[in-house]
UniProtKB/Swiss-Prot annotation:
It is found in: Cytoplasm. The keyword Heme does not apply. It comes from Homo sapiens (Human). This is Putative NBPF family member NBPF5. Its main location: cytoplasm. The gene is NBPF5P. Residues 165-179 have a biased composition (Acidic residues). Residues 10-43, 69-115 form a coiled coil.
Length: 351
């Protein structure tokens, strides 16, 4: 035989449970309040006992010495416990700040990783389109350069996003650039050194280089290297003649250079009639004949150089390539050599 539960009894039981639970909660709240009150009273009593113990210690009451020591000992322990709690609270605060900063850094790293994934995804997509072009003409020319530049920019953006210390790297790059600029400013300019070396090159070598370069620009001549070699050799002969002539006294050179072409014969006759300076009387006839023959040889070399230049010239050559044989200096030197040769001949015949 089964007995059915009465619904009214079940409701009463539930109501009793709720009432008992509520009553217990109220009692717990009252107990907590009483505990707080007792704790407060205990702290007040403890503070009062500590102050009284200090006063009794001042008066040196021997009767209450044990009580005073116990109170002071308890107070000292409580102070140590309080200091320990404060120290733990400070450490907890520091740890909390550290955890907060690490959480912030972790958030930034997650953001950087997300941006890095996006950039790598764009770079991968760009490289796929670059390596598999639809149009074959698109893989050449300006389009290829633009795509490569875009890929390079995306790669740099990815590296910049994933680098942990961007600011420090930028500062180091700026310092390196400043050091490079200072080194470049301190080092001598290569162009200035080259200009200084060019100033030290002799004039005859520059003329020789000009002749060789002017000949080398004409590709139609098959015998061009042979001709330039001969002209250079003749130029060396002319230079040697000029150097030997320049070793003579400076006053004779100026007199010979100042002779006009139209009055050359008159001046030669005057030189033949004029008396020989005393220093020429000291020379022997053999030495004069040797010097006259040497000057004649120099004159012959100059004339032969001019003849060679005329023989090897053709309409295709640049007229400026042999300009050094037709310069005013060369003409004046030739006139000076002729005048000096004839003056030596006149002086030798007069003796």
């Amino acid at each position: 035989m089964v007995v059915s539960a009465d619904p009214l009894s079940s409701e009463r039981a539930e109501m009793n449970i709720l009432e008992i639970n509520q009553e217990l909660r109220s009692q717990l709240a009252e107990s907590n309040q009483q505990f707080r009150d007792l704790k407060e009273k205990f702290l007040i009593t403890q503070a009062t006992a500590y102050s009284l113990a200090n006063q009794l210690k001042k008066y040196k009451c021997e009767e209450y010495k044990d009580i005073i020591d116990s109170v002071l000992r308890d107070e000292l322990q409580s102070m140590e416990k309080l200091a320990e709690k404060l120290r733990q609270a400070e450490e907890l605060r520091q740890y909390k700040a550290l955890v907060h900063s690490q959480a912030k850094e972790l958030t930034q790293l997650r953001e950087k990783l997300r941006e890095g994934r996006d950039a790598s995804r764009w770079l991968n997509k760009h490289l796929k389109t670059l390596l598999t072009p639809d149009d074959p003409d698109k893989s050449q020319g300006q389009d290829l350069r633009e795509q490569l530049a875009e890929g390079h920019r995306l790669a740099e953006h990815l590296v910049h996003k994933l680098s942990p210390e961007n600011d420090e790297d930028e500062d180091e790059d700026e310092d390196d650039k400043d050091e490079e600029v200072e080194k470049v400013q301190e080092s001598p300019a290569p162009r200035e050194v080259q200009k200084t070396e060019e100033k030290e090159v002799p004039q005859d070598s520059l003329e020789e280089c000009a002749v060789t370069c002017s000949n080398s620009h004409n590709p139609s001549n098959s015998n061009q290297p042979h001709r330039s070699t001969k002209i250079t050799f003749k130029e060396h002969e002319v230079d040697s003649a000029l150097v030997v002539e320049s070793e003579h006294p400076h006053d004779e050179e100026e007199e010979a250079l100042n002779i006009p072409p139209e009055n050359q014969n008159d001046h030669e006759e005057e030189e033949g009639k004029a008396p020989v300076p005393p220093r020429h009387h000291d020379k022997s006839n053999s030495y004069r004949h040797r010097e006259v023959s040497f000057l004649a040889l120099d004159e012959q070399k100059v004339c032969s150089a001019q003849d060679v230049a005329r023989d090897y010239s053709n309409p295709k050559w640049d007229e400026t390539s042999l300009g050094f044989l037709d310069t005013p200096l060369a003409r004046r030197e030739s006139v000076a050599l002729k005048g000096r040769t004839r003056s030596w001949q006149h002086s030798s015949h007069a003796n």
